[in-house]
Amino acid sequence: MICGTLVTVMVPLKMLFPWRKWRNFWTKVMLGIGSLFIWINKGIFLLVHRVVWEISGLKKLDLNRQYLVLSNHQSSVDIPVIQGMFHKVIPFPRFFIKQQLLWVPFLGLALWALDMPVMKRYSKSKLKKRPDLRGKDLERSRKACEQLRDQPLTLLNFVEGTRIDPSKHSDQNSPFQYLLRPKSGGIHAVLQALGDQLEAILDVTIIYPGFQSPGLSDLVFGRLRRIRVDVDQLCIGEDGVPTLEQIRSREAGVHIRKWLNERWQRKEQLIKQYLEEQGEQEFSEIMETQAAVPDPV
């Protein structure tokens, strides 16, 4: 609360002058405050709730580079987990926000001040009425990313677009047992705008043993005792990742979707193997158990 208030209070200072150096200075100050907030949350994880972290793949990372982080999205706990895990390891994580969030009092100002890239999506009905808008969301996302060039940066993208739950899993007719279908739009924009500057793509797989989708209450009240995270470092043009030439081609969407589907197949096998080794319940059993106990948070 205090950190959020400080960021909001500093927004007028950032807006005072249009000079790039001035605004960059205040952005760095606000990111420092955001980093302090993450440090406090991480301390709560480690000291108060004594959560056991099982993390693999955190090596040869740099605070002064640019990274794209991809992750499965299981719960509201995912963001504090990723922020805490990467704190002081890579730059402060930013993520795409919906344009509507900018109009939320105080929150919108803070998100703008932290230079969160804004995404505006059009519904199928809107595109049917206005076919000229097709592709505009991708172009806007690409331009938002271009404004973040030439600075240390981490962009976090939950590729599934939403948190998993039984109804969404069923509605999508997902081919995966533990995941929703990956969406390529946001990744496409990032790779086109920043692909030549990215140090690495970090493919993150989060697993909560005993839970498919834990709530914040499970964390706060100590029911979430263990968190497993696998980080796979990838480079453009290697490890099956499309090359810069493919990313900038007319067939970029096809190449990126194919690659993401391959990554999600690997992620599915990784989760399945880990849960089998731990003797965990099947996906459907865990979801049915959690659906019977609503999360108050």
Residue ranges of model-derived segments:
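N-terminal membrane-anchoring alpha-helices
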Residues: 1-50, 288, 293-297
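Catalytic core of membrane glycerolipid acyltransferases/transacylases, capturing the structured
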Residues: 12, 16-37, 63-130
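A cross-family acyltransferase "interaction/gating" segment
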Residues: 102-122, 149-244
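Surface-exposed cleft-lining segments at the edges of enzyme active sites
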Residues: 123-135, 174-177
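A Trp-anchored, charged/polar loop motif used as the substrate-binding/catalytic surface
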Residues: 133-146
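Accessory terminal regions of nucleic-acid processing enzymes
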Residues: 243-297
